[in-house]
Amino acid sequence: ADKRGESYVINGAKHWITGGGISKLHLIFARVYENGEDRGIGGFIAIRGEADGLKIGAREPAMGLRGIPETEILFEDLEIPAAMAVLPPEGLKRGFAGLMNAYNAQRVGAGTVALGIAQGAYEHALSYAQEREQFGRPICEFQGLQWMLVDMSTQLAAARLLIHKAASCGDGQFPDVTEAAQAKIFASETAIRVTNDALQVFGAADYSRNLPLERMARDARMFTIAGGTAQILRTVVASQILDRKLPQTRDGYAKLAERAKSKAAER
């Protein structure tokens, strides 16, 4: 976003916008430049239909979660008046930190949705295992399948407790960075495991698109990706439990060491 007088002009594009083309109000986070100098990150409000430079791209043919569109949004000389800018009170340099804090709350919600998908898949599998008969008895009486159902129920119970802990945040202010990340990691990976095992319980019967489990398996896959991948969230948790920033750039550690050495010399 280039600051030009009392306005900000945004050019660029953003992919995988959930609800793109449906939502009227758009909150855009962009890096702000003034006279060619990077000032930090700020938020900008644009209203679809009233902002000429806001364009909605094609809908992505998504693998799952097809109930709401995922689109590209294009910014072509999108002019935002200063009155529609959402700037951090601490200054633009704190804009990225504020954006990431908003993600922490979203992660608890995403983990909850993943848990709901997994719970639904488990309930379908549990019911089917008691109804489906093979070799003269319900398949739930076979020990191997019992173990699968027990593992599914155990993982669901653990995921639910992590989400409740992150949502209640009894030890501090919501959202807690570590608890939100832990809840999303475990719940999202549980959703993939449980939907996959539920498919196995059904066998060929649920490999069909006529039954809901194939949709659940597709929907579950997104939750280890969106809102921070499971791998990035592990880095977030690591930085919290080690109580140190973990740079992701090739020379990040060297820069931190130089900064620490410089501060020590100043003392």
Regions found by a protein language model. Give the residues of each.
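Short beta-strand/turn micro-motifs at beta-sheet edges
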Residues: 62, 86-88, 136-137
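Long, acidic (Asp/Glu-rich), low-complexity accessory segments flanking structured domains
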Residues: 76-97
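A short core secondary-structure module
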Residues: 7, 11-56
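Alpha-helical interface subdomain recognition
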Residues: 3-8, 74, 101-267
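Conserved hydrophobic/aromatic beta-strand scaffold that supports enzyme active sites
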Residues: 25-29, 43-45, 70-77, 222
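Solvent-exposed alpha-helices and their adjacent loops that cap or buttress functional pockets
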Residues: 2-3, 18-22, 34-38, 63-67, ...
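Flexible, small-/acidic-enriched active-site or ligand-binding loops
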Residues: 52-79
